[in-house]
Amino acid sequence: NEKQLRPLRAEFQIVFQDPFSSLNPRLNVEQTIGEGLGLKKLATAEISQRIDEALEKVELPISFRTRYPHELSGGQRQRVALARALVLRPKLLILDEPTSALDRTTQRAIVKLLRRLQQEHQISYVFISHDLQVVKALCQKVLVLRRAQVMEFQSTEQLFLNPQTEYTRQLIEASQYV
């Protein structure tokens, strides 16, 4: 029930595919990142400090506090969405196609950032993606779904070396860039 779920919600956060539509255009970066902290009944100084820490973690300057989503690039917006999730110090981060709306250079930067954050903060990810190149670069284990059915589940290395289903083989083949 709702009462039992409430404490668990702080343990996980989600970052959506399209950072522009997931950010409120009326809130600046500071308000966006700090919004969830308001529920924690923290002192203003601590909220401010945690916002600064979150910006630093995602490699955005403190000066971005006053910017609005329309003033940011796609990669910067995705970093704000990550900071908004990280500021609550979750144990699990659900990443729903977090790089699909970004160009390849920005994708690589976000994947590198996600790897660093995972190592530094011991965060687990559920990474949802159709881009197997990004999955290969970031994930340790892969669960392949087809029409809500589990096709296979194994280490990323084994999945790419020895896929167990024809469907997975086709996905891998289709993801190879010429």
Question: Whereabouts are the PLM-identified features?
Answer:
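A short, surface-exposed alpha-helical micro-motif characterized by mixed small hydrophobic
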Residues: 135-137
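ABC ATPase NBD coupling module
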Residues: 1-13, 39, 158-163
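Conserved ABC ATPase "signature" region
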Residues: 38, 45-63, 172-173
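A short, proline-enriched helix->beta-strand linker immediately N-terminal to the Walker B motif
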Residues: 87-91
